[in-house]
């Protein structure tokens, strides 16, 4: 009984398979019989859709043939092998960069230290350096440091320049080889070429704004008495410097 049922089922199945094989038509484009049924268009049993494996194109029974290029009806999404290879290399590189497989580790201690001790901005440091340089140039326009020894040399040279005009004027005040008057002994120089103490004391009392030429006064003759003779005029109270004017 069971065997008879099996034979009946197989007998029923085979005609259906043969019917499907007979229903599948050949390709209207290339005439190949290597075709297969795909689906019903718009779920309508009157519009079965087939696919030809020879020309790799679709068609619908009872419909018009469209000018579909060869292979245009294939629904397989083909991806180029080069892109897949590039994706594989990219994934391998990413995995080698992160051996742990997770996000990169962050040193919390370093982050906290940077938060407590922030680094100064480079632009602020450069601005401070420029301000310091500007202040230095304002204080010292020549841009050179004043060495004490160099400044002393300048003072010595200025002192010599200050004395030389006085010496030249005194030499011009000579009286053609005549012996000096008693007051002119103050103008004598010592063996080292330095003025006597009395002249230097008088020189110190000269104002800063007075030039060396103005500091030396012209000889002034003081007449003690109109009745005195010529000897009193020469050797009396005559002096090349008017010391009373300084007082």
Swiss-Prot record:
Keywords (A to Z) from UniProt: DNA-binding, Metal-binding, Nucleus, Transcription, Transcription regulation, Zinc, Zinc-finger
Keyword Lipid biosynthesis: no
Location(s) in or outside the cell: Nucleus
GO biological process: regulation of DNA-templated transcription
Gene Ontology molecular function, alphabetical: DNA binding; DNA-binding transcription factor activity; zinc ion binding
Subcellular location, principal: nucleus
Residues annotated for Zn(2+) binding in this entry: 27, 30, 52, 55
Keyword set includes Transcription regulation: yes
A Pfam family reported for this protein in Swiss-Prot or TrEMBL: Zn_ribbon_Dof
GO CC annotation terms, alphabetical: nucleus
Biased composition (Polar residues): 82-94
Functional note: Transcription factor that binds specifically to a 5'-AA[AG]G-3' consensus core sequence.
PANTHER family per UniProt: DOF ZINC FINGER PROTEIN DOF1.4-RELATED, DOF ZINC FINGER PROTEIN DOF3.5
Name of the protein: Dof zinc finger protein DOF3.5
Lineage: Eukaryota, Viridiplantae, Streptophyta, Embryophyta, Tracheophyta
